[in-house]
Amino acid sequence: MKPPMQPLTQALPFSLRDALQGTGLRVPVIKMGTGWEGMYRTLKEVAYILLCCWCIKELLD
């Protein structure tokens, strides 16, 4: 019998892990905090994702 697999969210940075928790499809969900804090956190997560995508693109080129 196979050992139970750990969800993908444990391998991701904590901010993305927080965004992914609670979704059945395990897709990112933007969580807004209060005022500018939520916007700042969302912008940081978007910047992180874009940076990762750019790095992967550069590695594949």
From Swiss-Prot:
It comes from the Eukaryota. This is Lens epithelial cell protein LEP503. The gene is Lenep. InterPro entries: LEP503. Preferentially expressed in the lens epithelial cells.
